[in-house]
């Protein structure tokens, strides 16, 4: 191992409000990068970023990574990856860490963003939702090596993750010997406890 991979800047953005006060996913991702660079303590770190990895969202952009690099005046345009459905999000982090540790890259941005609430508000408020048009392809599209689920799982649980999460929570609850209400309260505590960063 040549280098040690560490997180040097993070950001998370959540918006609420009326349609006009909400941003599209591209603007949210751009703002998250700006805040993460600021959080790093040295905004010049942007000149050492060699790649940007983004899980494909519900948006239509082909390559938000290159747009964000240009919009933030990165010295070099990083290699961009868009990972499609079926690739675990943790894999983006794992790949970046591995490449840093091998000395293949200096730094990576792992980025994601959605504007589903703005899309919902557009329906409620009867407004038209537009996205910035980005037609340039990323350097790499990453697809899952195999299907995420088998035919039996698809028939019983569907294609949405919610069924799988419920199944995992049921298994955890059973393993811990908890009653349903007891397990629900435990999960509620997880989500209502203050964040370590607060």
Q: What are these language model-derived features?
A:
Residues 1-26, 139-158, 169-170, 174-182, ...:
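Condensing-enzyme catalytic core mediating Claisen C-C bond formation in acyl metabolism
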Residues 12-34, 56, 79-91:
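Active-site pocket-shaping loop/turn-to-helix segments
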Residues 31, 94, 162, 166-170:
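Residues on a specific face of well-ordered alpha-helices
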Residues 37-49:
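Phosphate/pyrophosphate-binding loops at sites that engage ATP/ADP/AMP, CoA/4′-phosphopantetheine
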Residues 49-55:
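Short glycine-rich phosphate-binding loop at a beta-alpha junction
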Residues 56-121, 125-150, 154, 158, ...:
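Conserved catalytic cysteine-centered active-site region
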Residues 191-198:
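Conserved small/polar residues in nucleotide/adenosyl-binding loops
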């Amino acid at each position: 191992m040549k280098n040690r991979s560490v997180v040097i800047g993070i950001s998370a953005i959540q918006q609420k409000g009326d349609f006009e006060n909400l941003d599209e996913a591209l603007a949210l991702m751009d703002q998250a990068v700006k805040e993460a660079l600021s959080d790093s303590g040295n905004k010049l770190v942007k000149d050492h970023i060699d790649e940007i990895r983004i899980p494909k969202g519900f948006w239509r952009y082909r390559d938000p990574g290159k747009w964000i690099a240009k919009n933030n005046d990165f010295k070099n345009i990083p290699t961009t990856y868009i990972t499609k459905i079926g690739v675990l999000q943790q894999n983006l982090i794992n790949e970046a860490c591995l490449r840093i540790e091998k000395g293949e890259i200096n730094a990576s941005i792992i980025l994601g963003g959605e504007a589903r609430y703005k899309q919902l508000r557009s329906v409620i408020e009867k407004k038209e939702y537009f996205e910035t048009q980005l037609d340039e392809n990323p350097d790499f599209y990453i697809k899952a090596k195999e299907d995420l689920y088998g035919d039996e799982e698809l028939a019983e649980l569907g294609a949405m993750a919610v069924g799988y999460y419920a199944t995992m929570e049921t298994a955890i609850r059973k393993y811990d010997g908890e009653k349903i209400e007891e397990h629900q309260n435990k999960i509620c505590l997880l989500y209502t406890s203050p964040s370590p960063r607060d």
